[in-house]
Every structure is written in C-alpha cells, then in structure tokens.
Curated annotation (Swiss-Prot):
PANTHER family: RIBOSOMAL PROTEIN L30
Residue ranges that the Swiss-Prot or TrEMBL entry lists as coiled coil: none
Species in which this protein is naturally found: Pyrococcus horikoshii (strain ATCC 700860 / DSM 12428 / JCM 9974 / NBRC 100139 / OT-3)
Gene3D superfamilies per UniProt: 3.30.1330.30
Protein name: Large ribosomal subunit protein eL30
Highest taxon of the lineage: Archaea
Gene Ontology biological process terms from the UniProt entry: translation
Family statement: Belongs to the eukaryotic ribosomal protein eL30 family.
CC per GO annotation: cytosolic large ribosomal subunit
Molecular function GO labels: RNA binding; structural constituent of ribosome
Keyword vocabulary terms for this entry: Ribonucleoprotein, Ribosomal protein
InterPro entries on file: Ribosomal_eL30, Ribosomal_eL30-like, Ribosomal_eL30-like_sf, Ribosomal_eL30_CS, Ribosomal_eL8/eL30/eS12/Gad45
Length: 99
C-alpha cells in the first residue's frame, strides 16, 4: 500500500479538507478521522494540530516531505501544510497510517 496512491484515492472518493485553519477547526471538534501534516509545517500550526488532535483522539501522521511536495502529490498548484481526512471514501489510508 502506498501513501500517495491512497491519499489520491481519498481525495477522489472521500472527503479531504485542505488547509491548516480548517484542519485545526476539525481537530478541535473531532470532525476528522485522520490528520496529515507536512514535515516543514510551521511549529505553531503543528503544535495546535497535535494538541487538539490528542484531545479529540484523532491520529496525526507526519508526512515525510515538505508542504510543497504534499501539494504536488495532491495535484494542487499550492503548498499544503496540513489536511484532514473526514471520510476516507474507497481508500485504505486509515489502515496504512495505523501501521
């Protein structure tokens, strides 16, 4: 199983929310099943995401690449520092990250 493949599948068949503000909001409310944060995301954003995700019992996966690489992987012409998986759709991304 490949993270890139499963992430694209989740984007196509599920509900994926991009952006740090929305990701933090979903972490606060417990509205995400998984949060992915880029390795080089700003420290303040990462701290908020990890804090609220822990309170809401949401797993956080740190993407090994940069926010530019994460945006490119998703086919977006902009950087993506973090994203929230609300519905994985047909992807198996939740199982991949739990390993």
């Amino acid at each position: 199983m490949d993270l890139a493949f499963e992430l694209k599948k989740a984007l196509e068949t599920g509900k994926v929310i991009l952006g740090s503000n929305e990701t933090i909001r979903l972490a606060k409310t417990g509205g995400a099943k998984l949060i992915i944060v880029a390795r080089n995301a700003p420290k303040e954003i990462k701290d908020d995401i990890y804090y609220y995700a822990k309170l809401s019992d949401i797993p956080v996966y740190e993407f090994e690449g940069t926010s530019v690489e994460l945006g490119t992987l998703l086919g977006k012409p902009f950087v993506v520092a973090s994203l929230a998986i609300v519905d994985p759709g047909e992807s198996r991304i939740l199982a991949l990250v739990k390993r």
